[in-house]
Amino acid sequence: MQTWDVIVIGGGHAGCDAAAASARLGARTLLLTHKLETIGEMSCNPAIGGLGKGHLVREIDALDGVMGRVADASGIQFRLLNRSKGPAVRGPRTQSDRALYRTAMQSELSGQANLEIRAAAIEDLMFEGERCVGAMDADGHAYHAVAVVLTTGTFLRGLIHKGAERIPAGRAGEAPSIGLSDTLYGLNLQMGRLKTGTPARLLKSTIDWDSLEQQAADDVPVPFSFMTDRIEVHQISCAVTRTTEATHKIIADNLGQSAVYSGAIAGRGPRYCPSIEDKVVRFADRSQHQIFLEPEGLDDDTVYPNGISTSLPDDVQQAFLETIPGLEQVVVKRYGYAIEYDYVDPRELDATLQLRKRAGLWLAGQINGTTGYEEAAAQGLVAGANAALFATGREPFVLSRSDAYIGVMIDDLITRGVSEPYRMFTSRAEYRLSLRADNADQRLTPKAMELGLASRGRGAVFCRKMEELSEARSLASNLSLTPNEARDKGLSVNADGKRRAVTELLAYPDVGWDRLVGIWPELGRVSPSVSEQIEIDALYAGYIDRQQADILAFRRDEAVRLPRDLDYSGIGGLSNEAREKLERARPETLGQAARIEGVTPGALTAVLAHVKRRTQGAS
């Protein structure tokens, strides 16, 4: 009987990074998916990154994950969002060529040592007592493993809705997974239904591009991967159009035919990616909504109209599309739809994304109530890495809220749960000045190297960068000016008699590296990427120093571990609400307990006192 260390079920974004992470750690890994040709498929929007999401991709890359490199190899319109704002909230994004992305992902995985890939429709999981030990396909073939990672996307009892149509499917043209859903319900897990949607796909040649506003790519593309020197894929523009009052009238007149508004869908959709029906109802005072017309590839005649996902019938979709400027003669290649699917309440998971009730089983991606490729891949990496560590007898790998956006997301999921699909924003991170996209490698690559998660090539590139950064910082710290000298050079600083080094001068808003090169030509030898890093560090230095005190306090609370078998019913001073929520979430640390809604400071004090008494009694 062949037994793998880790089996990953599902070849979407979570599954790809899960399988790659497991294999990089040396675990014998098997990736099982319905169809080999759909590995890395971009089921919805052909884009990677954005606000908050771009940070996740940088962090995935810093841990030597695959999404960033694949996005760089397939990106056809790179744009840095929030460029006019501070570096902490800037978000790298690209539209991808859908076919190039899929091909690049499959190439990455096929070249990964320790990874085998097979086509199989998995319908059941296998258990020995309370531990998951493998999976079984629809033909009854068993696959045995020490650890299993489940990344099912929207396939768990997936149901497509379009007007009055109901089509069982995981996505258009692919069968749902019924058996796996039944298995999970049989484990007595808290589960529910969520929904997401996608717009129609349009024929490129039938759009009046000349009449529309064009949005070009950035002149200098900003890659996702710290391993990418330059973007070599041809860059294109997309177009911008808007709905009209006529569009809104057609939609409003046909709301009863929308699956979302007819009551056919029970699951909640993503708040920050609403359907066009939702937009018309919720923002009734607005006469138009923006639509980005995004080509799906360099050699693809398909266009993705970003901003008008819908579950209206085909004829209504056609009618409202023809009222949109530039789309008056449009031909639809495939109409939009909503899809409803099962998910597991993520409070059933621990910080490694392993089920609390069943050892050896990890969940990642939309099955945990998230939305988005980036959120899925980040969870996949953490789940895959921890499954491999578990299978090979090593300590788990956990990222905290002060380490990474990945840590913020996982902590949000396992302590607060979800009532709607969760997506990442920079505003979710209380330490976002420290958790920037530009320093993701400095925060996380050393952890990946220590763990064995990073390749030798990644480690070598990182070490060279850090050497160059150290030399540049040393140079910058040894060059300084007095206020009088600064004034003579045209720099306006406080007249306090204090000498200021380059790093201190850079903290002034009107002082940049290029300006200082005019004073000290030797600074011109520093590479642009390193000088930019020093500028950003200087800009945030004062704020980060203050934030470090908050991080230290946070880590003190995170260091207080709460026993897994803690009986909250036996702790005096807890309200019924606090007791119920603590029992439900089973927080692993005092810090996690503090982030549960309804758990007051008084409740935390009572829990801490109880744990201390229990610890003292045991000793």
Swiss-Prot record:
Q: Which domain of life is it from?
A: Bacteria
Keyword flag Cytoplasm: yes
Q: Which residues bind NAD(+)?
A: 269-283
What keywords would UniProt list here?
Cytoplasm, FAD, Flavoprotein, NAD, tRNA processing
SUPFAM superfamilies the record matches: FAD/NAD(P)-binding domain
One molecular function GO term is: flavin adenine dinucleotide binding
GO biological-process terms attached to the record: tRNA methylation; tRNA wobble uridine modification
List the HAMAP family. MnmG_GidA
Q: Which NCBIfam families match?
A: mnmG_gidA
Query: What quaternary arrangement does the UniProt entry report?
Result: Homodimer. Heterotetramer of two MnmE and two MnmG subunits.
Protein family: Belongs to the MnmG family.
Give the protein name, as stated in the record: tRNA uridine 5-carboxymethylaminomethyl modification enzyme MnmG
Originating organism: Maricaulis maris (strain MCS10)
